[in-house]
Amino acid sequence: EFLSIDDLDITDSKAVLNYFNSNKFDFFVNCAAYTNVDKAEGEIELARLINAVGVRNLALSCKDQNATFIQISTDFIFDGKSSIPYTESDLPNPINVYGETKKEGEDEIIKTLNQFYILRTSWLYSEYGHNFLKSMLRIGADKSELDVIFDQIGTPTYAKDLACVILE
């Protein structure tokens, strides 16, 4: 079952508790997040409410049901200064509100649960929705030359591959 904010507001602890009391889970995948990196700088409390408090609400309910929690996180928990890809053993050092609040959410999971997976993705793309690849293809169809940043290192993540990993 896939839920939207209309189905479940993860920032509402009572709503989360009621939802979990009405459903039984072996696994719970959280894709909900405040993801507008730039806007988060001016909406700190909203970003924290969704990315940290909401995650805590879900983690507590997963703990009550002994359900394995799968959290979709981000490479923004790192400072981006490494010249090589990050690994799960690298120490987080977020440099913006988005990264800080996603790290806070990860911390809530780690302190609450024994059964969890945190999947840190970056540059997510697919044939659906809005993403960098689709934007570049669209703009490239209209222009003979594209100006894009070239000082970032990342690992594009195909959404279907990520979904397959989660299902395994």
Q: Would you name each region that the model predicts?
A:
Residues I10-S13, Y34, A52, L91, ...:
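Structural motif corresponding to alpha-helix initiation and N-cap regions
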Residues A15, N57-S61, E108, D161:
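Conserved mid-core alpha-helix of short-chain dehydrogenase/reductase
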Residues E1-L8:
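A short beta-strand-loop structural module common to alpha/beta enzyme folds
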